[in-house]
Amino acid sequence: MSKLMQEFKKLLESYDGQGWDAQSFEFDYDNHAAICEMKHDNGNKLKFYIDYHTQIISVYINGKLKDQTKLK
């Protein structure tokens, strides 16, 4: 597993069990990215955007950037 996906797995596990349920996971081949969408019990939506080119994982909640992690 790549370092980027290992970091994503850690982030995903930090949200798991806190009311978030995975809805979809897809690859955006044109932009060299992976996208994981989750939904919370309260209706909030979370999206992980994993950019393979820049090595940045972005976390959006309800369309607003909440956090970014850049691998070194």
Which sequence ranges carry the predicted segments?
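Short intrinsically disordered terminal tails
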Residues: 1-3, 69-72
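Short, non-transmembrane alpha-helical segments in secretory-pathway proteins
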Residues: 1-21
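Short, low-complexity interaction segments enriched in Ser/Thr/Pro/Gly
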Residues: 6-7, 61-63, 67-69
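Acidic, low-complexity, intrinsically disordered interaction modules
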Residues: 15-65
